[in-house]
Amino acid sequence: MAEKTYPMTQVEKDQLEKELEELKLVRRPEVVERIKIARSYGDLSENSEYDAAKDEQAFVEGQIQILETKIRYAEIIDSDAVAKDEVAIGKTVLVQEVGTNDKDTYHIVGAAGADIFSGKISNESPIAHALIGKKTGDLATIESPAGSYQVEIISVEKTN
């Protein structure tokens, strides 16, 4: 069975590699040290510090595995390889809802780089699905829980 790929820009992959390095070189040794200290307190059956450190160790190791998988199966998307005005991963899109003056800006990123609070939406999101492949001036229908609506793509730029 083929492994799932994780579309992302090179910048996103670099960020994941930096985060992985932080987990392996800083967080993992810190947790090991906390476990060592907690063990020195004696009886592990009622040692909350030990339990908390082991829980944190499991979390850190899980995060390391997730990041290693995403990096190993990263599919680097070169936004320069698509038309300048075409929506793709690594592009910033300004849209206007048809019939209104409401405008929104979205930065399309791979799922690993999504952060709705900074306007970075996953390529797997309904909004990105509706926009990817469209060009400046095109209309796109976005499906939302409140119903569907149309937007016009006002501009498309490469995200820095």
From Swiss-Prot:
PROSITE patterns: GREAB_1, GREAB_2. Pfam families: GreA_GreB, GreA_GreB_N. GO terms for molecular function: DNA binding; RNA polymerase binding. GO terms for biological process: DNA-templated transcription elongation; regulation of DNA-templated transcription elongation. Keywords: Coiled coil, DNA-binding, Transcription, Transcription regulation. It comes from the Bacteria. The keyword Transcription applies. The keyword DNA-binding applies. SUPFAM superfamilies: FKBP-like, GreA transcript cleavage protein, N-terminal domain. Residues 1-72 form a coiled coil. Necessary for efficient RNA polymerase transcription elongation past template-encoded arresting sites. The arresting sites in DNA have the property of trapping a certain fraction of elongating RNA polymerases that pass through, resulting in locked ternary complexes. Cleavage of the nascent transcript by cleavage factors such as GreA or GreB allows the resumption of elongation from the new 3'terminus. GreA releases sequences of 2 to 3 nucleotides. NCBIfam families: greA, PRK00226.1-1, PRK00226.1-4. PANTHER family: TRANSCRIPTION ELONGATION FACTOR GREA. Belongs to the GreA/GreB family. This is Transcription elongation factor GreA. The gene is greA.
